[in-house]
Design a protein with these regions (language model features):
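Short S/T/G/P-rich N-terminal loop/turn motif that feeds into the first structured element of a domain
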Residues: 1-53, 60-67, 93-114
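A contiguous, mid-protein "functional segment" used to position or interact
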Residues: 63-98
Length: 114
């Protein structure tokens, strides 16, 4: 099942290291089937506060996303970003194409006290 590596980059500032990171990241993703879904840009905040921007990278599955993140190639370039940008990174699993939130709501409803 598809998975996503998501990073919230708070107040990113461009510098030579960050540009080098951007230039090199695709080569680290290719062996794991990663592709950018969202790569920064303006965020249209509708609820709450959201300082910064977001990056979303799609992978074939959670194992591929984790293997990419933990790979020596990615770990080598990671400090180029993390030394300059305050961020949070995570991996989440997607839902199947036929996902119906009503089934989830029904399961949760069954857990509620009567």
């Amino acid at each position: 099942m598809t998975a996503y590596a998501i990073a919230h980059l708070r107040n990113p500032q461009l510098n030579a290291d960050v540009v080098d990171y951007i230039d090199r990241i695709q080569a680290t993703m290719d062996p794991f089937g990663g592709r950018f879904i969202v790569h920064g840009g303006e965020v249209d905040v509708r609820e709450g506060e959201w300082p910064g921007t977001i990056v979303i990278i799609e992978f074939p599955d959670a194992a591929a996303a984790a293997e990419w993140y933990d790979s020596p190639e990615y770990q080598e370039i990671l400090p180029l970003r993390t030394n300059h940008i305050d961020s949070v990174a995570l991996i989440v699993k997607g839902v199947p194409a036929d996902y119906d939130p009503r089934a989830t709501a029904a399961a949760y409803r069954a857990l509620l006290p009567s």
